[in-house]
Regions:
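RNA pseudouridine synthases
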Residues: 1-319
């Protein structure tokens, strides 16, 4: 429940909003306001909980009353997002499923899941612009920027907690489709190789197989074979950064047009074959999970975009 005066807004925290940090809560209330400004008003004591000053890490409880001061920014949120209006509108066309608890979309390749690291626009920012009335929208999991496919978003904090629990307990099944170099051997049904993440000076993340890394496993199944490539279904058992991309490379079958782990000769073959492919061929094809509100087991599939379909058709015709 909210009450407002011309200068101050008082928000009563519901059970669904409880448990989150005050700084994260303010980001949902003050859309378009820079994080630096949010921390400044917290530091200066302009934000109060139950009439007391609080620190950014304070966790809200049901029944808390949050005093939010008026915040002026140089640009209104609508103006700030205007260069991306076409991308925002496009997100409406790729929503696969939505109810009061969750939203599932077919993320386009080339779009980051969230802004940051020099990116001003991501899926979550776009969804918040598309659904300005939504009090809560948070990513349940992530996809690499160049990976397309099923992306799950929680619309309630209780839904986010339930779905994160499923991820931790391996109760969520993800299936990806990847086009890899050469003939994947049918007997290779699983790759188990520990992965170690390195951060370069540029800030770029590179992952490699290392005994010092975290245990990682991906299961594989051949879907279709072509003259010099294989379409494989990849089901990660663990959820490490770049896991499928590094495991396929480790198995000797890197994914097409992977800007970090690819085989350039394989990419050249695909170009010369007239596939028209110019992006990472990794697509999150399906996601199976238990609905956080109803308990129903759901399996949502995301179709490949036309570019990936054309590529596969070219390879079929060339056999």
């Amino acid at each position: 429940m909210k009450t407002e005066t011309p200068s101050v807004k008082i928000v009563a925290i519901t059970a669904d909003e409880a448990g989150q940090r005050i700084d994260n809560f303010l980001r949902t209330q003050l859309k378009g306001v820079p994080k630096s400004m949010i921390y400044r008003i917290l530091r200066k004591g302009e934000v109060r909980v139950n009439k007391k000053r609080i620190k950014p890490e304070y966790k809200l409880e049901a029944g808390d009353e949050v005093r939010i001061p008026p915040v002026r920014v140089a640009e209104r949120e609508e103006e700030a997002v205007s260069p991306h209006l076409q991308k925002v509108a496009a997100l409406a066309d790729v929503i696969l499923y939505e109810d009061d608890h969750i939203l599932v979309l077919n993320k386009p390749s080339g779009t980051a899941v969230h802004g940051g690291s020099g990116l001003s626009f991501g899926v979550i920012e776009g969804l918040r612009a598309l659904r300005p009335e939504a009090r809560f929208l948070e990513l349940v999991h992530r996809l690499d920027r160049d990976t397309s496919g099923v992306l799950l978003v929680a619309k309630k904090r209780s839904a986010l907690r339930s779905l994160h629990e499923q991820l931790r307990e391996k109760g969520m099944q993800k299936d990806y489709l990847a086009l890899v170099r050469g003939q994947w051997q049918s007997h290779v049904k699983s790759v188990q190789a520990p992965l170690l993440k390195n951060i370069l000076q540029s800030g770029e993340r590179i992952v490699r197989v290392s005994q010092e890394g975290k245990p990682s496993e991906t299961r594989f199944k051949v879907e279709e074979r072509y003259a010099f490539a294989t379409l494989v279904r990849c089901s990660p058992v663990t959820g490490r950064t770049h896991q499928i991309r590094v495991h396929t490379q480790y198995a000797g079958h890197p994914i097409a047009f992977d800007d970090r782990y690819a085989d350039r000769e394989f990419d050249r073959q695909l170009t010369e074959a007239g596939t028209g492919l110019n992006r990472l061929f990794l697509h999150a094809a399906a996601l199976k999970f238990t609905h956080p509100g109803t308990g129903e087991v759901m399996r949502i599939e995301a179709p490949m975009d036309e570019g990936l379909k054309r590529c596969l058709q070219k390879l079929r015709n060339a056999r």
